[in-house]
Curated annotation (Swiss-Prot):
InterPro entries: PPIase_dom_sf (IPR046357), PPIase_FKBP_dom (IPR001179), Trig_fac (IPR005215), Trigger_fac_C (IPR008880), Trigger_fac_C_sf (IPR037041), Trigger_fac_ribosome-bd_bac (IPR008881), Trigger_fac_ribosome-bd_sf (IPR036611), Trigger_fact/SurA_dom_sf (IPR027304)
Source species: Streptococcus agalactiae serotype V (strain ATCC BAA-611 / 2603 V/R)
Main location class: cytoplasm
Family statement: Belongs to the FKBP-type PPIase family. Tig subfamily.
Segments forming domain PPIase FKBP-type: 163-248
Gene Ontology MF term list: peptidyl-prolyl cis-trans isomerase activity; protein folding chaperone; ribosome binding
UniProt free text on domains: Consists of 3 domains; the N-terminus binds the ribosome, the middle domain has PPIase activity, while the C-terminus has intrinsic chaperone activity on its own.
GO BP term, pick one: protein unfolding
Membrane-spanning segments: none
Cellular location(s): Cytoplasm
EC number: 5.2.1.8
Entry protein name: Trigger factor
Length: 427
């Protein structure tokens, strides 16, 4: 194979490469065997036309496109490897010449990975808005949340107050005309929960069972239903019942009801403190890691980030998100309908972070290369075992989904992140 590379601009160039007759001939044979199955020519049984007759009737050139599709991927990859290029986007392939009996000549317009000039990435000093300390108030708040989960609703006489639940019928209208989604029967609404649009719940404070209240509100300007956004509306609301929470006493019996592994309230609080400390330690470490990586990226210089890399990252993130939705039984159409958004909105959302994610990956990859990080066979096997355990899969299933190169890359990236974070200190 003959290959050459011509720089056209920063991170852009043209690869010129050839495909030899040794590669072309077997590809032509494969192409002929594929197309002859569908050939129905007088004088021959379907699929049994000799190659010589095919060449006379259609010309060998009729096989070139199919043959090229067979040999191109491998030939292109070989050219990239021979030139030592790190290509980051799909190439634009052009045929220069495909003459019978001669090597085929092609060009590939490519985008290459930008140069990363690393700055400081070790012994960084960072600030984080996180703490490992757990206060008594945080422990008490967790107990109180669990206590409220065990609360029972009982019907009460008198006026509804914040925190009470009202059972209501409501009919909404704009300019006297009812609108879709503005009607409900026997709906349980906790006042102060923020379930309804601003201003609605507050107007039911002080109401009593049996009353009908006109609730006047204005839909927010950014309301998901565009035909209602910014408009004044009236909800004729009938209160059937007012219910209040009856929370259990804060004692040892409550503790046992919450967690059957404890005997006293003090034991429950001690258990919650350990859980909160563990969660806070993880959150603190994550915050340090995020801040250290962000500083390492800021200290580095990336020579002209190709827009194709950002574009590919946006689509990768969108496809991953929509794939997760579909695994939960939510189609893209259903998601956009439920959220009142469009594919363009989702694209903009991911576009905002794509540039940062691409730069971060490039810098971490550059650190891994600078440190000479590689994955051992033992580390690869451990990664496979860990992933299999995490996702409840067989190890062979993981091997089938992830190539060895992907696993090696991920392990090297983790080592680079560890270099950044393990030496970082908090101001």
């Amino acid at each position: 194979m003959s290959t050459s590379f011509e720089n056209k601009a920063t991170n852009r160039g043209i690869i010129t490469f050839t495909i030899s007759q040794d590669e072309i001939k077997p590809a032509l044979d494969q192409a002929f065997n594929k197309v002859k199955k569908d050939l129905n020519v007088p004088g021959f049984r379907k699929g049994h036309m000799p190659r010589t007759v095919f060449n006379q009737k259609f010309g060998e050139e009729a096989l070139y496109e199919n043959a090229l599709n067979l040999v191109l991927p491998k030939a292109y990859e070989a050219a990239v490897a021979e030139l030592g290029l790190d290509v980051v986007a799909q190439p634009k392939i052009d045929v220069v010449s495909m003459e019978k009996g001669q090597d085929w000549k092609l060009t590939a317009e490519v985008v290459t990975k930008p140069e990363v000039k690393l700055g400081d990435y070790k012994d960084l000093s960072v600030e984080v808005d996180a703490s490992k300390e757990v206060s008594d108030e945080e422990v008490d708040a967790k107990v109180e949340r669990e206590r409220n989960n065990l609360a029972e609703l009982t019907v009460k006489d008198g006026e509804a107050a914040q925190g009470d639940t009202v059972v209501i019928d409501f009919v909404g209208s704009v300019d006297g005309v009812e609108f879709d989604g503005g009607k409900g029967d026997n709906f349980s609404l906790e006042l102060g929960s923020g379930q309804f649009i601003p201003g609605f719940e507050e107007q039911l404070v002080g109401s009593k069972a049996g009353q009908t209240v006109d609730v006047n509100v204005t839909f927010p300007e950014d309301y998901q239903a565009e035909d209602l956004a910014g408009k004044d509306a009236k909800f004729v609301t009938t209160i059937h019942e007012v219910k209040t929470k009856e929370v259990p006493a804060l004692d040892d019996e409550l503790a046992k009801d919450i967690d059957d592994e404890v005997e006293t309230l003090d034991e429950l609080k001690a258990k919650y403190r350990k859980e909160l400390e563990s969660a806070k330690e993880i959150a603190f470490d994550d915050a340090v890691e995020g801040a250290a990586i962000e500083l390492a990226v800021a200290n580095a210089e990336i020579v002209e980030l190709p827009e194709e890399m950002v574009h590919d990252e946006v689509h990768r993130a969108m496809n991953e998100f929509m794939g997760n939705m579909q695994r939960q039984g939510i189609s893209p159409e259903m998601y956009f309908q439920l959220t009142g958004t469009t594919e363009e909105d989702l694209h903009k959302q991911y576009q905002a972070d794509a540039d940062k994610r691409v730069k971060t990956n490039l810098v971490i990859e550059a650190i891994a290369a600078a440190e000479g990080f590689e994955a051992t066979d033992e580390e690869i096997e451990k990664e496979i075992t860990d992933l299999a355990s995490e996702y409840n899969m067989e190890a062979d299933q993981v091997r089938g989904l992830l190539s060895a190169d992907m696993l090696k890359h991920d392990i090297a990236m983790k080592k680079a992140v560890d270099v950044i974070t393990s030496s970082a200190t908090v101001k």
